[in-house]
Amino acid sequence: MANEEQGSILKALDVAKTQWYHVTAVVVSGMGFFTDSYDLFVISLITKLLGRIYYQVPGSSSPGSLPDGISAAVSGVAFAGTFIGQIFFGCLGDKLGRKRVYGLTLLIMTICSICSGLSLGRDPKTVMVTLCFFRFWLGFGIGGDYPLSATIMSEYSNKRTRGAFIAAVFGMQGIGILAAGAVSLLVSAVFESKFPSRAYILDGAASTVPQADYVWRIILMVGALPALLTYYWRMKMPETARYTALVSKNAEQAALDMTKVLNVDIEASAAKNDQARVSSDEFGLFSMKFLRRHGLHLLGTASTWFLLDIAFYSQNLFQKDIFTTIGWLPSAKTMNAIQELYMIAKAQTIIACCSTVPGYFFTVGFIDYMGRKKIQIMGFAMMTIFMLSLAIPYHHWTLPANRIGFVVLYSFTFFFSNFGPNATTFIVPAEIFPARIRSTCHGISAASGKAGAMVGSFGFSALVKALGMSNTLYIMAGINLLGLLLTFTIPETNGKSLEELSGETEPEKIKEKIVV
């Protein structure tokens, strides 16, 4: 039996039951994040291999390694591209619409993933320059996926489960990290079985077989597959009803799009004077009215994301160095080039399975019950505690009998970053800003995070060399504590509609007839 009710498009979105389309949107948007994290984190697995292939010094007592500057560039150049892409595509998503630029980011990621693996030349300089060039543009495409995926998912979702939906999209980052390790394990195992060689300590020249040059290229190019496979479905997604109604001022089209995907019949009857009232309340980005309403919120989302990413990316990108320092990974001399890649990938995969991935999905399960702010405070607090637990008795953890304990505590920092601020810093900016600048503000917040990632990727190894691992861990603990304090500048968004949070429209401003 059909019941006729007066309501709004926006209210219909907020009260809509979870349907198959929501699940489809999570998968399609999430596969972009799967690709993002695979491409960003896989580089940390292959840098040791690149050093052996291109920077081996004949007769040296230790395997070749990338020079510090080149290592930092290879690890961090994608973040520079991501930083620019987040701001550029964030603004474009508000100007042109979410859908119109959503497919472009995926195409850039696909093309540049392939080109990264096809980096030109054989001499070290040429290979590194072309690799960095394509990884910069890969990062540019990845950057666009952050504000667009978050904004699209928040605008599609109902208010009851919105946090879980956005967290599920972001949770694909964990699956991407896991996949990066798994693919590296598989490729290195296959090549090791087909092209075995002796450990470096036994035969330095022969420990890196010529075929190793194919290994890192294949691993990088695999990142193009998930992006390519979901391109068609991403282009089939309609523009979000919130953007169409509130920004494009086309209530009829918004009603039509909603009718197709959410199983409700809507007759749009929004009058022009209603839409004019919405427009009259508009204010520009960084206007005085924006700063009064949302200035502190933007400061909070940007600063907490910046601090989180310093710790998160330095931990991820340099965990191989940390594990080598404490002796959890064997000495590089005792392995050939492909075996070393295998062992690094194995360590990352274990950490991903035991702490990284579970953390993401704890967030999915609890965020709409606990709220965003509590989870973020808890995450920063626990990361601070575990970092101090590693730093204070650092010498204790370096003893052979205690190394597993170090790895366990280190894993907990990953768990609480993902069941904590790594997820919530992505979610909150997609909820608290008006629709007409939502994508831009999310892009600014995310770009602030990537600035932190660049600080982490370029600065972590320098800090360790200058201050030692123990003092560096103290600094990371301090960064997490500061992130906890700045969390109090953001509002709790749990259980509230996007329009209630942004204050951009009243329920009666856009009226439709809904038949359920």
Curated annotation (Swiss-Prot):
Note from the entry: Although related to the sugar transporter family, it does not transport sugars.
Topological domains annotated Extracellular: 47-71, 122-132, 184-212, 315-349, 396-403, 464-471
Any one GO CC term of the record: membrane
InterPro entries reported for this sequence: MFS_dom, MFS_sugar_transport-like, MFS_trans_sf, Phos_permease, Sugar_transporter_CS
Predominant subcellular localization, coarse grouping: membrane
Classification via CDD domains: MFS_PhT
Species this chain originates from: Arabidopsis thaliana
Cell location: Membrane
Similarity comment: family membership: Belongs to the major facilitator superfamily. Phosphate:H(+) symporter (TC 2.A.1.9) family.
Protein name: Probable inorganic phosphate transporter 1-6
